[in-house]
Amino acid sequence: MALKLNPVTTFPSTRSLNNFSSRSPRTFLMAASTFSSTSTKEAEAKEVTWTTKRGAYASDPFHAPTGSWEIFKSLGRLGLRDVLISHLKPVEKCWQPQDFLPEPESDGFEEQVKELRARAKELPDDYFVVLVGDMITEEALPTYQTMLNTLDGVRDETGASLTPWAIWTRAWTAEENRHGDLLNKYLYLSGRVDMRQIEKTIQYLIGSGMDPKTENNPYLGFIYTSFQERATFISHGNTARLAKDHGDMKLAQICGIIAADEKRHETAYTKIVEKLFEIDPDGTVLALADMMRKKISMPAHLMYDGEDDNLFDNYSSVAQRIGDTAKDYADILEFLVGRWKVDAFTGLSGEGNKAQDFVCGLPARIRKLEERAAGRAKQTSKSVPFSWIFSRELVL
């Protein structure tokens, strides 16, 4: 799952975590929680302080509404099972990376590789930095499956559970796994990038994990994945368009087929949240507002190559400059608010009405902030080296 969005100011929230700005695995997280002889539930409710070399913050768990576990169990048993399964494809009907790559068993393999490399020579360095960043983000798939399995009421309890939620998570992971495989092999064959530096970055990223601030809460978790899959669909679609603009129709096809997968997955996750709004509009709008106040953290925000502590920000800046990133954070939020018809709900609690007003008014507030940030960025452009392209420099 890739996501490259403009930085957004965090709006205050009594439930939000203080901003965690670590970008590098040089920053180690240490859980300093005190567990006594209290029950498991009491221990889980205790405040946990995470200490880093750049500061500390305390977690204040946002609890899902009472009965949410039962809601998710019933969703899995009832109609949502068919909804989830309908957005998966049988393995035998899925494309595989080899469908788009030179055939190693063929006598024409070397010629096919030469043709791929000839097309790749026409692509600029900044495009390859974006493509590499997308691939690295996709390759951190173990982290994303782990995150889904932290969510209460939907996690895979055995590793091979036959609940609808567990089946979905494993099948989603299996489909996503092809994305990193395909882009990795393409980049290897292109000869345009430093594969060892890329491989180091992948290892660092998986080892660092991620903190999406979903706090084991399935409401927050599926709002987060809806946002991320929408961003990923847009990103890969733009990468396909840019490849086409540079004349590489094969690479455009590769990025386009990945984008199509992401669109299916986006649809599935947004339907889950849509169903939550139908069953529990108050709890869901409160969760949406909470997630937006904390802001959506990027899956690869701890990206590091052993050299650049600001690698993710620099990669994101290049993506924004060449037009690969989603236009802004506000576009995705506005799309989801419309998709879920958040402004149409009535009969909410007082807190629910406040959350509804906050979420519906947020895109306009974000755009104003982003316009100011874009103006400042134009005045402070600089060049930085990227190890992925043999330390050649690019303008941010």
UniProtKB/Swiss-Prot annotation:
The keyword Metal-binding applies. Its cofactor is Fe(2+). Pfam families: FA_desaturase_2. Residues 1-32 form a transit peptide. Pathway: Lipid metabolism; fatty acid metabolism. It is an enzyme of class 1 (oxidoreductase). Fe cation 2 binds at residues 176, 229, 262, 265. GO terms for molecular function: metal ion binding; stearoyl-[ACP] desaturase activity. InterPro entries: FADS-2_CS, Fatty_acid_desaturase-2, Ferritin-like_SF, RNR-like. Its EC number is 1.14.19.2. GO terms for cellular component: chloroplast stroma. It comes from the Eukaryota. Binds 2 Fe(2+) ions per subunit. Homodimer. Converts stearoyl-ACP to oleoyl-ACP by introduction of a cis double bond between carbons 9 and 10 of the acyl chain. This is Stearoyl-[acyl-carrier-protein] 9-desaturase, chloroplastic. It comes from Linum usitatissimum (Flax).
